[in-house]
Amino acid sequence: MHTGTTLTQFIIEEQRRTAGATGDFTSLLNDVVTACKAISNAVNKGALLGVMGALESENVQGETQKKLDVITNDIMIRSNEWAGHLAGMASEEMDDVYAIPGQYPLGKYLLVFDPLDGSSNVDVNISVGTIFSILKAPVAGRAAKAEDFLQAGTKQVCAGYAIYGSSTMLVLTFGHGTNGFTLDRDVGEFVLTHPAMKIPTETKEFAINASNMRFWEKPVQRYVDECLAGKTGPRGKDFNMRWVASMVAEVHRILTRGGIFMYPKDTKDPSKAGKLRLMYEANPMAFIVEQAGGAATTGYQRILDIAPEGLHQRVPVILGSKTEVDTVTGYHHEKAA
């Protein structure tokens, strides 16, 4: 039995500290948390419920959808469409904005989410997660349009992710620190277990898909070569390489023990500036990481400063321990000079 601060208590105390708070945001976040609990249960029981494996359909990204992609997307929608807090939703799994059904009132917030990040790993029992971001609607009470969502990451009211692994955790930021909560399944409540999470500025771990090395830009090749050179190289220390192929798992490791995660720009598909989606993955994770003392860039600019051009825009992502991110970003700027 837990004896610590529950997420419900934490959110209400946050509300009390916010001038003019009406409780709308608190209620919205509670609905998001409820969805994450339901998704955790679905992921945990996947094979028992017969929901593992792929479908014949593709999402807007051209990626083959897993059964759980569709199920978890539906859970997020059904949990959040009805309460009157939202003007609209956008999901990595849907082509366009999800309009709030006419029988429900419209609110003043926008919800953006990736319902099951890392879903390609779900069949092999590797940690996956849900990533979400909450924005203010430009016009409260009006059905949201696609352009309403195209706000820089600095405009996020809240960002978070749930990770479904050996335990289910929820990591949140409201813009003044990053906090982690662990689900106590006995009582069905998230409990504060990782207050004021901080990413070490120095690290000896880097995460990147090295099979794409031949497609990387020179600054990334240089950085990885220097890491691999170890103590006898220019960095003067040995590094370990990690790669889980689940952004939630990578970022969670970095938040708990440091490191740098890179999904850089490459020439594998010149039509794509990067692999990860700005709205659904890069912005919320950049917000979380920065609030934990880390840094997040594309190699050329701060991710949170990007002016979005589309709901499904892709960007390069380099995030984690500030010293390492600054080093890689510096190499990109040297190239551009």
Curated annotation (Swiss-Prot):
Q: Which residues bind Mg(2+) 2?
A: D114, D117, E281
| Predominant location category | cytoplasm
Q: What class of enzyme is it?
A: hydrolase
Indicate which residues the UniProt annotation says bind substrate. D117, G118, S119, S120, N209, K275
Name its cellular compartments: Cytoplasm
Keywords assigned by UniProt, alphabetized:
Carbohydrate metabolism, Cytoplasm, Hydrolase, Magnesium, Metal-binding
Q: Name the Enzyme Commission number(s) assigned to this protein.
A: 3.1.3.11
Highest rank taxon of the organism: Bacteria
Q: Which GO terms describe its cellular component?
A: cytosol
Disulphide bonds annotated for this chain are none
Q: Which GO terms describe its biological process?
A: fructose 1,6-bisphosphate metabolic process; fructose 6-phosphate metabolic process; fructose metabolic process; gluconeogenesis; sucrose biosynthetic process
Record's cofactor remark: Binds 2 magnesium ions per subunit.
Q: Which Pfam families match?
A: FBPase, FBPase_C
> Per the entry, which co-factors are needed?
Mg(2+)
Where do the annotations place Mg(2+) 1 binding?
Answer: E92, D114, L116
Report which reactions are catalysed by this protein. beta-D-fructose 1,6-bisphosphate + H2O = beta-D-fructose 6-phosphate + phosphate
Q: In which pathway does it act?
A: Carbohydrate biosynthesis; gluconeogenesis
Q: Which GO terms describe its molecular function?
A: fructose 1,6-bisphosphate 1-phosphatase activity; magnesium ion binding
Per the record, the similarity remark reads: Belongs to the FBPase class 1 family.
* Subunit structure comment from the entry: Homotetramer.
Record protein name field = Fructose-1,6-bisphosphatase class 1
Q: Encoded by which gene?
A: fbp
